[in-house]
Amino acid sequence: MVSRPGDLPALEAGPGSSEGLLGGMSIPAGMTRRALSYDDNLERPMSPPPSDINISNLWKRPVIPERKFARLAEEDESEGGVKQSASFESTKPIPVVKAKASSVMNSLIIKQTQESMQKFEKQAGLTDTGYTPHKGLNAEETRYHRLAESMHKLQMQSTDAKEERQPSSNQSTPAGTPQSSPKQKRRGWFNSQGSTASLTGSEMSTSSSSSVDLASAEGPIERWGVFGPRPQVSKSTTDPGTHPDTSGGFALQSYKGAQKPTPMEVMKAQATRLAEDPTNFKAPPKMEIPTMDGKRQVTRPHKLKHRDMNVLTPSGF
């Protein structure tokens, strides 16, 4: 087989000749050569490559095999060949700027989101009129740098609106449960009042046992502070409450049933017990120690008889 200058050497030389690399064997139809375009190999069986395929050709125009669409191109040319040639000539000399698609898409997406944010800013009235741009930045760029500030403003405005919607004078008299008390506790990232409120709540909670219970169940008792200064209850914590203290804005009545002892009281009671009878705590270990020793003395000696040795010796002896 004579190879033309543009061809790649075929592995199979033909059915009749045995000069090929593999003799009479040919490559199975499913395997494709590296240099051929896949469109041709899908339709026709394996054959030596046509003369117009070259390695340099493949690099320059790999997308469309021209032989396949030659007939279509001829028909188009017969209809309006002049228009086609003119359009081809006009499109060829345009310079091509190469860029990664991912970077282009990223910049497009960023720009689009920023523009939509600015639209929203204008609608919500968040734009800063007295804003002066940085020396090194254009006015276009400074709009994008203000996005974080505008988002922060938006959050602050929304929280303010929520707080205004909840009127503080819903109830003129306090309700029985602390959950429905009129002052709403404001929660936010930027509020630094929570720590001070909890401090005052813990200070106030030491006045009476009922308020201790409230503080443990509800948290800081800062929400009861709407009704004026809190009345000081001059009763000891162990006293069962006999009369309600009605001098303040609402009745403070201590719980008459069984009250939880505070941890300090528990510690004091334990200390007094220890002082009264120290033998109670030291007696159990003293009682246990001799019995344990007695048991150990009983179980310690092992006297093996001669008849028991056959259990301990291996069977081969």
From Swiss-Prot:
Keyword field:
Cytoplasm, NADP, Oxidoreductase, Phosphoprotein
Q: Where in the cell is it found?
A: Cytoplasm
Domain of life (superkingdom): Eukaryota
Record bears the keyword Phosphoprotein: yes
GO MF, one example: oxidoreductase activity
Give the Low complexity compositional bias ranges.
Answer: 198-219
Keyword Cytoplasm in the entry? The reply is yes
Q: Which residue intervals make up region (Disordered)?
A: 1-26, 153-261, 278-303
Q: Report the EC code(s) recorded for this entry.
A: 1.-.-.-
State any GO CC term: cytoplasm
Q: Which is a Pfam family this sequence falls into? A: P33MONOX
Record PTM Phosphoserine, positions in chain: S181
Give start-end positions of Polar residues composition bias. Answer: 167-182
- Mainly localized where? cytoplasm
Which family does the entry's similarity section mention? Belongs to the P33MONOX family.
What's its job? Potential NADPH-dependent oxidoreductase.
Q: What is the protein named?
A: Putative monooxygenase p33MONOX
